[in-house]
């Protein structure tokens, strides 16, 4: 990602939403971020009667955000995402350098303890997953990586000799090394064999290579056809790249895994609101419970601020951290009334 101080090139697009997409792609933001920002800027423009946003200012932004909070009843995280989209649009697309951009109120996120699964609950969920979905869930729990990071793993990111997995350009565009669970090595090798069959099939059919990071694709346009850059968890069918329009093989869809995981949680009789991201929370809590220091866990999770990691220490204190309830000190009741 480009630094905030780097000069931005002139925009070629004419329509404001196309300008927004152009700037997002230039700065290497993810497709999901692009879709979210376009959604919120479009909603903002429609909210104000399709007026050009260059004619709108602080009061109009505040009115839109108030409507989201008071009428739409959106969550704090959704509210903050909408604000981030507008700040990006005014700052990076319209290049508006006005004080009100930074003075707009930001709602404080609620501090909720993350949902954490016990080892027994993880085993029960895994028992209702099959094939690639089970392996992927094991990988998330065994490494603590985010679901997007796991889906974007390339063949070259797995180092069986050194027992490491490289997560490239994770959140914040930072690379980090994770442990490759020994118990998963055989299954991951089998997964690579299945992936190679898909790769060979694409090669034989003359298919387009897999998508690459923008700068790399421009510099090495044929790299996407090479085996090291192929997906570890490749989709079994081809689809159209929403940005380039090229028909190619994508990685496994996150929605497909999300649905499979949700079914497994229900079938396992887990009443906690568990999602795939819960496996990451459970990984962090398990390491802290095993005695690993907070800085080690921070590095493995890829947190830029240790305060983000500290939330898991609060999870360990649930139940009073060994404090005995005064109710348990009362003598037993002789009879019920």
Curated annotation (Swiss-Prot):
Record-linked Pfam families:
Phage_int_SAM_4, Phage_integrase
Q: Which GO terms describe its molecular function?
A: DNA binding
Keyword entries, A-Z = DNA integration, DNA recombination, DNA-binding, Plasmid, Transposable element, Viral genome integration, Virus entry into host cell
Q: What range(s) does the Core-binding (CB) domain occupy?
A: 14-94
> What InterPro entries does the record point to?
CB, DNA_brk_join_enz, Integrase-like_cat_sf, Integrase_catalytic, Integrase_integron-type, Integrase_recombinase_N, Integrase_SAM-like_N, Tyrosine_recombinase_XerCD
Catalytic center residues: 146, 171, 277, 280, 303, 312
Source superkingdom: Bacteria
* Protein's UniProt keywords contain DNA-binding: yes
Occurrences of domain Tyr recombinase (ranges): 112-328
GO terms of biological process kind = DNA integration; DNA recombination; establishment of integrated proviral latency; symbiont entry into host cell; viral genome integration into host DNA
Q: What else is known?
A: The sequence shown is that of plasmid IncN R46.
For this protein, the record's NCBIfam families field holds: integrase_gron (TIGR02249), PRK15417.1 (NF011946)
**PANTHER family (alphabetical):** PHAGE INTEGRASE-RELATED, PROPHAGE INTEGRASE INTD-RELATED
Family of the protein in this entry: Belongs to the 'phage' integrase family.
- According to UniProt, the name of this protein is Integrase/recombinase
Gene that produces this protein: int
């Amino acid at each position: 990602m480009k630094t905030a101080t780097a000069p931005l090139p002139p925009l070629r697009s004419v329509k404001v939403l196309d300008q927004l997409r152009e700037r997002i792609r230039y700065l290497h933001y993810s497709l999901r971020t692009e879709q979210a920002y376009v959604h919120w800027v479009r909603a903002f423009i429609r909210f104000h009667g399709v007026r050009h946003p260059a004619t709108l200012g602080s009061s109009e932004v505040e009115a839109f955000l108030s409507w989201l909070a008071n009428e739409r009843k959106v969550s704090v995280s959704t509210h903050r995402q909408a604000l981030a989209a507008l700040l990006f649009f005014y700052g990076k697309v319209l290049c508006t350098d006005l004080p009100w951009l930074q003075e707009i109120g930001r709602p404080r996120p609620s501090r909720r303890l993350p949902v954490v699964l016990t080892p027994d609950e993880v085993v029960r969920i895994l028992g209702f997953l099959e094939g690639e979905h089970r392996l992927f869930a094991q990988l998330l729990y065994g490494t603590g990586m985010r679901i997007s990071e796991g889906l974007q793993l390339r063949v070259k990111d797995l180092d069986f000799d050194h027992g490491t997995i490289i997560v490239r350009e994770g959140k914040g565009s930072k690379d980090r090394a994770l442990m490759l669970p020994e118990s998963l090595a055989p299954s991951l090798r089998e997964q690579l064999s299945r992936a190679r069959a898909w790769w060979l099939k694409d090669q034989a059919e003359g298919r387009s290579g897999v998508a690459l990071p923008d700068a790399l694709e421009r510099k090495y346009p044929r790299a996407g056809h090479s085996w090291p850059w192929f997906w570890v968890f490749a989709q079994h069918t081809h689809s159209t790249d929403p940005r380039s329009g090229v028909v190619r093989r994508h990685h496994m869809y996150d929605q497909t895994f999300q649905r499979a995981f949700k079914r497994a949680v229900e079938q396992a009789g887990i009443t906690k609101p568990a999602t795939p991201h819960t496996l990451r929370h459970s990984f962090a809590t398990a390491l802290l419970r095993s005695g690993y220091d907070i800085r080690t866990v921070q590095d493995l999770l890829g947190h830029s601020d240790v305060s983000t990691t500290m939330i898991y220490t609060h999870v360990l204190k649930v139940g009073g951290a060994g404090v005995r309830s005064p109710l348990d000190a009362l003598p037993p009741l002789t009879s019920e009334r």
